[in-house]
């Protein structure tokens, strides 16, 4: 569907693990607009926090280019996610509006009651008054990347296959099969999650989320299509998403903070309670 934050996240992950060829060669997605922008914007930045994970990074020209592309798309992703959270308070992710918690002059960020020094303090595309606003060039690059994703025949064929054959859960041969977790409270009761202004739990939660995902592809109402696209991002990262099931996704912390205790992602109570027979009986 070309959901902007999902597109940015996909590219970032490929760069993080040194798998950009999956997009370029596997799906025919042109990374030149991002590469050009990264060189123009971060050409003098060593981007040390953005070296690919695994393998040896000797700092050759190709690796330096990918580091800069990595930082460029990461900053775009953080902006897009910050805006999504701000515009959708029912996601319950206000504490993840981290771009608004950064002191850009001193190079620190306040998370909870603690203030941490940033490992990378250079943010040339951040508007201090509107930190989650894309620059004109960032928006232009993102539009080109989204166009490439939407027009990749192989990618669209794979997504069509998932929509035709896949589902969030299925009853098969007397067994209930489902992705991820069933969001629970600490006492083992099913957690109520707000979606589109109403509260859902258990099977009803899976049903409404799958309904919204499919709306992203088939609805003729632009607003509903947009809501559906945003649901795809919600499923990927939100604490109340059955597919994620952790209190937060610490992408920002892992790039910018040295304190590893900030990297912790606490799993939903489901993962502790599912081993108990009384939980299954509910």
Model feature map: region roles:
Residues 1-282:
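Feature recognizes metal-dependent phosphohydrolase scaffolds
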């Amino acid at each position: 569907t070309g959901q902007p934050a999902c597109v940015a996240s996909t590219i970032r992950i490929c760069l993080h693990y040194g798998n950009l060829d999956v997009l370029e060669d596997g799906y025919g997605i042109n990374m030149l607009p991002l590469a050009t922008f990264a060189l123009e914007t971060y050409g003098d930045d060593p981007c040390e926090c953005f070296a690919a994970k695994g393998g040896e990074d000797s700092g050759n020209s190709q690796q330096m280019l990918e580091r800069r592309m990595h930082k460029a798309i990461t900053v775009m992703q953080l902006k897009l996610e910050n805006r999504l959270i701000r515009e959708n308070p029912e996601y319950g992710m206000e504490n993840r509006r981290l771009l608004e918690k950064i002191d850009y002059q001193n190079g620190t960020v306040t998370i909870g009651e603690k203030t941490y020094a940033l490992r990378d303090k250079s943010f040339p595309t951040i508007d201090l008054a509107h930190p989650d606003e894309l620059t004109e060039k960032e928006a232009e690059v993102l539009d080109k990347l989204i166009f490439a994703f939407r027009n990749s025949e192989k990618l669209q064929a794979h997504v069509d296959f998932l929509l035709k054959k896949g589902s969030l859960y299925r009853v098969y041969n007397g067994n209930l099969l489902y992705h991820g977790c069933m969001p629970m409270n600490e006492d083992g009761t099913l957690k109520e999650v707000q979606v589109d202004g109403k509260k859902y739990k258990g099977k009803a939660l899976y049903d409404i989320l799958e309904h919204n995902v499919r709306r992203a592809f088939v609805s003729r109402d632009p607003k509903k299509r947009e809501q559906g696209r945003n649901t795809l991002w919600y499923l990927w990262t939100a604490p109340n998403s059955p597919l994620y099931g952790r209190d937060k996704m610490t992408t920002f912390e892992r790039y910018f903070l040295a304190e590893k205790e900030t990297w912790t992602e606490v799993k939903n109570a489901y993962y502790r309670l599912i081993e108990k027979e009384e939980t299954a009986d509910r």
